[in-house]
Amino acid sequence: MKYLTTASGTPVSTTTFGTMQFGGNADAHQSHAMFDAARNAGITHFDTAVGYTEGASETLLGQFIKPERDAIYLATKVGYVGGASRANMTAHFDQCRKQLDQDNVDLLYLHRFDDDTDLEETFTTFADFQQRGLIRHIGVSNFAAWQIMKAQSIAQKLGTCIDVIQPMYSLVKRQAEVEIFQVAQDQDIQIIPYSPLGGGLLTGKYARGETGRLTDDSRYNARYNQTWMHDTARNLAVLGADIATDPATLAVAWVAAHPAKPSPIISGRSTIQLAPSLAAENYTMSTDLYDTITALSLSPPPATDRLEEA
């Protein structure tokens, strides 16, 4: 498995901090406090996107990393809106660099697959950014396994490759186990999964009657509204209480403990909310505990759907 390094050659942290809340649910003061907490916990990998909080996320992150840029692995994303054409990617990336106040970034993702743009145009653009020293690594987010392989074959013909993928993955969203993780291992691609807490479901707060994205955002409610998912969250909270460990810590550490060695993206609205996820950075999960947690949710069927041979 490929391991990423900062520009100074230091391996990046095994946990990534996502800044989607910066400048939105977290104001500048709260955002800076979370950034400092992440750095104090040893996190060096920070993830953002051109459109997060209408650009405020990149602007704040750019300010925070400036005093120690060489120690930070900086990732951002383009193409969630407007597609993966050269013109749109270039316009977005120019906007990224302006908002971040950076000439270059370590990792640039295409935020999602674009059915309407030839992948050769997309990856010719990526390769050009690399050759000009504007990016070090290439990533794709929200791609299916076949899309990753098709893109990888084109990238390799252009003399480059996909270095990182960013799929959704958590105890209640395990589809990535079916083919995406295997593709990544086969192609030596680093896995940086998002939403290890299942939109906050796995913190246990919804079982306590609290509110959050699942109650406030119809997209998240639709994503995590199945009864078995809520049962899994309740059972994880019970397990956490039994072993005196916050369920959020267990959820993030479980993702990181997968044999494919993913590096989960954590986030929060405040340092208090962030703390249990940060604790996973140094949490050692035994094989027995990993298996116990795995059994709390439904395993996806194999790609062949031959369950008797799984």
Residue ranges and their predicted role:
Residues M20-F22, A49-G51, K77-V81, L110-F113, ...:
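Active-site beta-loop-alpha junctions enriched in small/polar residues
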Residues A7, N40, G62-D70, D94-D101, ...:
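Acidic (Asp/Glu)-rich catalytic clusters
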Residues P67, A71-A87, H111-R112:
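Structural motif corresponding to the early beta-alpha repeats
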Residues R97-D116:
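Active-site groove signature of glycoside hydrolases
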Residues M1-I72:
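N-terminal binding-site loop/beta-alpha segment at the start of enzyme catalytic domains
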Residues A26-A38, S85-L100, F123-T124, I148-Q152:
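Short, acidic/polar
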